[in-house]
Structure formats: C-alpha cells, structure tokens
Amino acid sequence: MTVSINEVSKYFSKQTGTVQVLENINFQLEKGDFVTVIGPSGCGKSTLLKIIAGLDNDFEGEIIIDGERITKPSKKQGFIFQEHRLFPWLTVEENIAADLSLKDKYVKDKVKEWVEIVRLDGFEKSYPKEISGGMSQRVAIARALLRDPNVLLLDEPFGALDAFTRSHLQEVLLNIWEQKKTTMIFVTHDIDEAIYLSNRIVIMSAKPGKIHKVIENKLPYPRSKNSESFQEIRKKVLQQFEYGGLIQTSL
C-alpha cells in the first residue's frame, strides 16, 4: 500500500484576488510509514491533510491511495481533528461504532477490541460529558481506526491537551502504530512531538506552502527526548527554521 501525493497545488479566491496556498507538493508514503508535517502557521498543513482525506477536491494534482485516485472521503482514510467531535448523545462505545450497529456481533467485537487498545475499559457506557478531554480524544482515535483505514490523518489531535495527557496519548498512538502498522500522517506545531513519533519529518515553508525539507528520523523506538541523538535531530530541524527562512516567513 502506498500513498502518493502528486503535483498538488491549491488556490483560494479572495476579494483581493487569488491566493496560492499550496505549490507543487510531491510526496510518497509506504505502508507503515509514520510521517509528521511541521511548518509555520499558514503554510497549508491542515489544507493538505483535508485534500488527502478527500474533504477538499478543489485542487490541482492528484492523491493516489493503494492505486485509487482520491476524490472524496472513503474507508481508505481515517481522520482525527483537533477537537474530538464526539456526539454528546452517544456513549463511548456508540461513538466508536459511529454509524455502525452495535447489534452486529462483528462490530461489537471490533468496538470491544478498540476500547481495550485505547485503554477505555469500564467507560463503554459513559457519555462525552462524563470523561476527560484526553479520554475523548482516545475515543476519536478508536473511531477513526475501527474500519481499518489504509492511512490515518491526524490534524494536531493533542494540541489542546496538557503536557501529561499529550505524552500519554503519544504512547497510546505509538502502541497502535506498532501493533497495526497503520500508515500515519500527523500534523503538529511541536518539534519534539514530531521527532518523538515519526520516522520522517516533512518541513513545510509558507506563502505558498511547499515542502522545504524532509528529514529521515532513524532513532530506534522507544525514544528518549533527553538522549543525545534526539537532541541532534532536534538541532537539524531547528536549523531549517533558523537558517531556511521559515521563521521570517511565518511573521
């Protein structure tokens, strides 16, 4: 399974004229890749993610997933937003099942499996208002992965969480990735998070958004943020921002 992002460009129309948001994005992922995307605000990270998800088909170029051109959302893509977007009138297990019936034994068993994977045992019958923000985001992760998507797209899913909860969910996500080998594309503003999670870091520049640099991250798992090798990669990433003009671009 591959994900191919080919010659993708995107324009927005404004009263003052047309603005190019993305320019000539080319990138490929193989099955099981974990890629993080970072860059200054306004460089089109979230826009690119929505294009890959099939949520935006007004663009130039093409997205190919497992040989199929993507023009709309499908079971090939799972998407996790910055907010969990749970249905407040549904329980945890009903939110994970979403539009599938829990009366179906296969669905019931799959939901049970994901409840265990994201460590929500005992909260199956709870409603979103009865659980924490971190737990709600775990429900969103389970919901997105229930249908075994080819690729999971994550748009800063931990950005609004406290440091402890974010660290915990990073471990949950890595455990899922190691178990299921799901291809992941994860947008973040956090350099340490990008290095900690992924095996490739895509750095984007802005105005218009384009790929500035791809850094291979071959650190073995599990990773320590305090290790010398981790800090070396962090230095490489920061150098791209400091000397690549990215900080100025974001001002």
From Swiss-Prot:
SUPFAM superfamilies: P-loop containing nucleoside triphosphate hydrolases. It is a peripheral membrane protein. Keywords: ATP-binding, Cell membrane, Membrane, Nucleotide-binding, Translocase, Transport. InterPro entries: AAA+_ATPase (IPR003593), ABC_transporter-like_ATP-bd (IPR003439), ABC_transporter-like_CS (IPR017871), ABC_transporter_ATP-bind (IPR050166), P-loop_NTPase (IPR027417). It is found in: Cell membrane. GO terms for molecular function: ATP binding; ATP hydrolysis activity. Its main location: membrane. Its EC number is 7.6.2.14. ATP binds at G39, P40, S41, G42, C43, G44, K45, S46. Residues 3-231 form the ABC transporter domain. It catalyses: ATP + H2O + aliphatic sulfonate-[sulfonate-binding protein]Side 1 = ADP + phosphate + aliphatic sulfonateSide 2 + [sulfonate-binding protein]Side 1. PROSITE patterns: ABC_TRANSPORTER_1, ABC_TRANSPORTER_2, SSUB. GO terms for cellular component: plasma membrane. The keyword Nucleotide-binding applies. Belongs to the ABC transporter superfamily. Aliphatic sulfonates importer (TC 3.A.1.17.2) family. The complex is composed of two ATP-binding proteins (SsuB), two transmembrane proteins (SsuC) and a solute-binding protein (SsuA). Part of the ABC transporter complex SsuABC involved in aliphatic sulfonates import. Responsible for energy coupling to the transport system. This is Aliphatic sulfonates import ATP-binding protein SsuB. It comes from Bacillus cereus (strain ZK / E33L).
